[in-house]
């Protein structure tokens, strides 16, 4: 598994519209080689036709508290290509990185996050997550803080829209552009409608629809270009990966937990794997 494929500056641009249809027999041969190589060799396996990007889910959340700056830095330290995060807008319109719709599970506070202001959110401390005892006064990051971290650590930003306002889209795109990350960034969502708003401000930011791979879903997105499907691991097959590639879509697979799962996905030709773990 190639965790950071090629030069960061090239980002996603080389992959756009250039999905390769790999000979099935060759794929089987490559998968066989991967399976017999020791795990320490898999991360260095870099054939020109196999360049699967590893994205840290909420950063490297198996090792650090999710959706925090330490988690994103850890993803970079582990050599991950990208860092996925979750985006909310607050009562005052501020944009912050957080997964849940309330702060109860992850912080020393209670309440719905969208009912809070940035000042109120920054007054909270994150008190849950892996290795949380290492940290005191760990804070919920803003979108700007996340983007600064990605830029500094050469991570591709992968931003899931959790609950934001349509009026926030331009601000999100402007912030991505302002940090010099427009060519590399990915926005994902369970609603395909967001691609229409994103395309008003950028054609360079890739949009990935969190859904199944189907011709129906592909047709919802295809006309807007630079798109993909973000699909759960148990919903992906060689056939629907081929369908996506034939229609110019990239395939990002999430909920991947083991090297065995990753090897299978490499074998059927997926483009990206999202995981809490460093998969060798």
Residue ranges and their predicted role:
Residues 4, 21-27, 34, 38-280:
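Phosphate-group recognition and catalysis centered on beta-loop-alpha active-site segments
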Residues 1-18:
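Short, Lys/Arg-enriched N-terminal segments with co-localized hydrophobic residues
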């Amino acid at each position: 598994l190639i965790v950071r494929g090629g030069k960061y500056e090239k980002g996603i641009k080389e992959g756009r519209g250039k999905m390769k249809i790999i000979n099935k027999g060759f794929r089987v041969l490559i998968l066989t080689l991967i399976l017999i190589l020791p795990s320490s060799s898999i991360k260095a396996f870099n054939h020109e036709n196999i360049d699967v990007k590893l994205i840290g889910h909420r950063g490297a959340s198996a090792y650090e508290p999710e959706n925090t700056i330490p988690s994103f830095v850890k993803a970079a330290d582990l050599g991950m290509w990208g860092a996925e995060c979750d985006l909310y807008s607050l009562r005052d319109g501020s944009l912050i990185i957080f997964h849940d719709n309330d702060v109860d599970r992850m912080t020393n506070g209670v309440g719905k996050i969208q009912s809070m202001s940035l000042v109120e959110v920054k007054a909270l401390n994150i008190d849950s997550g892996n290795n949380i005892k290492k940290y005191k006064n760990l804070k919920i990051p803003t979108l700007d803080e996340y983007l600064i971290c990605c830029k500094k650590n050469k991570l591709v930003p992968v931003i899931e829209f959790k609950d934001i306002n349509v009026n926030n889209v331009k601000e999100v795109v402007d912030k991505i552009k302002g940090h010099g990350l427009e060519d590399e960034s990915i926005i994902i969502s369970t609603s395909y409608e967001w691609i229409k708003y994103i395309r008003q401000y950028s054609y360079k930011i890739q949009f990935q629809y969190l859904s199944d791979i189907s011709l129906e879903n592909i047709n919802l997105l295809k006309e807007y270009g630079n798109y993909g499907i973000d699909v759960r691991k148990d919903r992906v097959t060689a056939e629907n990966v081929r369908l996506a590639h034939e229609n110019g879509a990239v395939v990002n697979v999430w909920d991947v937990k083991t090297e065995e799962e990753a090897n299978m996905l490499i074998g059927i030709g997926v483009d990206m794997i999202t995981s809490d773990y460093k998969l060798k």
